[in-house]
Amino acid sequence: MMHNQGNSNGDPAAPMSNLQEPQVPMLSQTPNPVPMMNAPAPLLRPAIPGARGARPPRLGLAIPPSPNVKPVGGNAAGPPLQVPSRPPLPVLHLATPMGSTVAPQEHQPNRGAQPGQSASGGSESSAAHSRTGSFGPLDGRGSNPTSAGSQYSALSFASQYGLGGAKPHGTPDPVSAVGSLYSNASEGGVGMEREGSMHGLEASFDKMSLEKARTSDAEDLDDEGWRIVSMENRIVELGGLGEGAGGAVTRCKLKGGKTVFALKVITTNPDPDIKKQILREINFNKGCASEHICRYYGGFLDPSTATISIAMEFCEGGSLDSIYKEVKRLGGRTGEKVLGKIAEGVLQGLTYLEAKRILHRDIKPSNILLCRNGEVKLCDFGVSGDFGTKGEANTFIGTSYYMAPERITGQTYTITSDVWSTGVTLLEVAQHRFPFPADGTEMQPRAGLIDLLTYIVQQPIPKLKDEPEAGIFWSDNFKHFIEACLEKNPKRRGMPWKMLEHPWMTELKTKRVNMSKYLTQVWGWDDPKGSK
């Protein structure tokens, strides 16, 4: 046996041309001769067992090769690769034949299918089924799921066999590779209309509901009818009425209808508390039947815009906030008798709410509406709430500037907190400015919220004062009424029904006030309609 002494240092990269191969005598007594080495040589790797003959040792990877894979560097030709070919059309089976009503069991092989292959052409192994519902090619080894670019993906099958233009019938299989490309009412999988929708409203609503919605005006529609008129695009916008934190309000009417209504569009909020407030407003208004509560017509959800629309009574006179600011712009002042009618309407509305065990919690000029004939109505019950058996609540909801001191300090409160807000509102309209601070200085009340709330709690209440330089004088009864509303001790503050018995209120009930004429003068209407 020849021993390569020049390569005994274990370096296979040493040049071979400068080495000599001396003849070493063989020991015939030893059947397995061992090469003689002068000194141990450092090894770069573990020795590969087995006789290698005269070939120099090669470096190898320490990771054993897979038994199913050809060894690295081997010269032996492996078996021919199985290249998947497009199966014949008769052999191709979609997971659920369109028209079948029974969904097949996933990974259940077809009796006529070859071993290792499902009826749809994929592996019967659960590993061969991808999350997107496509199947990998078969290679006899239970291959892993292929990527979205595989030639055997759902899109490839559909394009190869012209399946894109087919109109399937029946229930699509949720695990079908091609069934997800279709909807039951469109081609190419574009439409998302549900099965059995009959291409329109007829599937979602019965004929009687459709006929009623198409022949009714806004006052006679229920919530289902409002959804129908919304889907049929029968709501016509006539103009904007304003925007606020709660949403935008537009003046609308239905096609073919006569009733003009206000449509309040609210963008839904993921906060569950906000959703509860919106639902509370809708549900409460459904049961209201008072001339001093803004009438509710209905509401609907628009899934395409994620908004809630609330249709309510349109009050042509506008809000008290817009009215008194217009009077101020014109250089006038709202009279005491008009203020008395406004106070009466607000207290009547609060009395109705108290009977229903409801707190408004957001009385302010912008939430008091006037109709063209002068009727006073409360609106915006998004922050309204039920109170308990003692008539108390303890949540901090509403506009902070008009809150009663007990609400600002976090104490329990009752319906009398709305009486405080009524007094602040009347004082603001009478003076043409927000009543805090009481001395009339501009303390940036809307900017410094903490300072303002501290002032309301700690400082004396503002009082209604005469303005001799402007020729404005208020009655003593009116001044006392404001003081009674702004009583800081809630236990001494009057209930709404009790405030209706105040001498100022009983005195004004005997006087006739033409509220319609007042609004006509404010807004410059040509032909006043109605009077009160």
Swiss-Prot record:
Coiled-coil region(s): none
Superkingdom to which the source organism belongs: Eukaryota
Enzyme class: transferase
Active-site residues, record numbering mapped to chain: D362 (proton acceptor)
Gene3D superfamilies attached to this UniProt entry: Phosphorylase Kinase, domain 1, Transferase(Phosphotransferase) domain 1
Catalytic activity: L-seryl-[protein] + ATP = O-phospho-L-seryl-[protein] + ADP + H(+); L-threonyl-[protein] + ATP = O-phospho-L-threonyl-[protein] + ADP + H(+)
GO molecular function, one term: protein kinase activity
SUPFAM superfamilies registered for this protein in UniProt: Protein kinase-like (PK-like) (SSF56112)
Signal peptide extent: none
Keyword Nucleotide-binding: yes
Domain named Protein kinase: residues: 235-505
The keyword Transferase belongs to this UniProt entry's keyword annotation: yes
Matching Pfam families: Pkinase (PF00069)
This enzyme's EC code(s): 2.7.11.24
InterPro entries for the chain: Kinase-like_dom_sf, MAP_kinase_kinase, Prot_kinase_dom, Protein_kinase_ATP_BS, Ser/Thr_kinase_AS
Biological processes annotated in GO: MAPK cascade
Disruption phenotype annotation: Does not affect significantly the growth rate but produces fewer conidia. Inhibits significantly hyphal growth upon high osmotic stresses and in the presence of cell wall stress agents such as Congo red, calcofluor white or SDS. Accumulates chitin at the hyphal tips. Leads also to a looser distribution of spacers.
Binding site for ATP: L241, G242, E243, G244, A245, G246, G247, A248, V249, K264
Keywords from the named record: ATP-binding, Conidiation, Kinase, Nucleotide-binding, Serine/threonine-protein kinase, Sporulation, Transferase, Virulence
Its biological purpose: Mitogen-activated protein kinase kinase, part of the mkh1-mkk1-spm1 MAPK cascade that regulates regulates vegetative growth, conidial formation, colony surface hydrophobicity, osmotic stress, cell wall integrity maintenance, carbon and nitrogen source utilization, chitin distribution, septa formation, and pathogenicity.
Family assignment from sequence similarity: Belongs to the protein kinase superfamily. STE Ser/Thr protein kinase family. MAP kinase kinase subfamily.
PANTHER family registered for this protein in UniProt: DUAL SPECIFICITY MITOGEN-ACTIVATED PROTEIN KINASE KINASE DSOR1-LIKE PROTEIN (PTHR47448), MITOGEN-ACTIVATED PROTEIN KINASE KINAE MKK2 (PTHR47448:SF5)
Protein name as catalogued: Mitogen-activated protein kinase kinase mkk1
Organism expressing this protein natively: Cytospora mali
Lineage, opening ranks: Eukaryota, Fungi, Dikarya, Ascomycota, Pezizomycotina
GN (gene name): mkk1
